[in-house]
C-alpha cells in the first residue's frame, strides 16, 4: 500500500486532524483509528483502493475478523465476487458507499 492510498482513507476518517474509527462497533470501539482494514481481503483479490479500506481501531478490527457473519452483513467485509465500490458499509451508524477518492455517499434506501 502506498502512503497516498493510506492517507486517503485516514483523511476520510479524520475529525479535527485525528483519525477516528470508521466502523465504531457499539460497546467495542476504541475510537482512535490506527489500522487499515481491507473490506475485500487481499487473499480474495482485494486491493488497496480507498473503497476497499476502512480506518479502524484495533478493537473493531479484531471484532470484524472474529465475527465475519456480522461483518459481511454490515459491509465491513466484502465477498470475493463483489465490488467494494458497489457494496454499502455501515460507517459510524450510517450505511454509505465508499469511493476511491476518499469520499462516500449515503446508501439510497429502496422500498
Spans of model-derived segments:
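Context-gated lysine
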Residues: 3-4, 40, 74, 79
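Arg/Lys-rich, low-complexity, intrinsically disordered N-terminal tails that contact nucleic acids
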Residues: 1-9, 104-111
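Short flanking/linker segments adjacent to small metal-binding domains or redox-active Cys/His motifs
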Residues: 76-111
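Short connector loops at helix/strand junctions that flank enzyme active sites
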Residues: 16, 48-52, 84
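Short cysteine-rich loop/turn motifs with clustered Cys
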Residues: 2-35, 54-60
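Histidine-centered nuclease catalytic patch
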Residues: 22-55, 66-74
Amino acid at each position: 500500500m502506498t502512503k497516498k492510498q493510506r492517507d486517503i482513507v485516514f483523511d476520510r476518517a479524520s475529525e479535527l486532524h485525528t483519525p477516528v474509527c470508521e466502523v465504531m462497533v457499539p460497546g467495542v470501539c476504541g475510537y482512535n483509528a490506527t489500522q487499515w482494514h481491507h473490506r475485500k481481503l487481499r487473499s480474495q483479490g482485494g486491493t488497496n483502493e480507498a473503497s476497499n479500506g476502512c480506518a479502524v481501531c484495533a478493537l473493531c478490527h479484531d471484532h470484524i475478523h472474529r465475527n465475519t457473519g456480522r461483518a459481511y452483513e454490515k459491509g465491513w467485509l466484502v465477498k470475493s465476487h463483489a465490488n467494494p465500490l458497489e457494496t454499502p458499509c455501515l460507517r459510524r451508524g450510517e450505511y454509505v458507499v465508499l469511493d476511491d477518492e476518499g469520499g462516500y455517499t449515503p446508501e439510497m434506501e429502496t422500498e
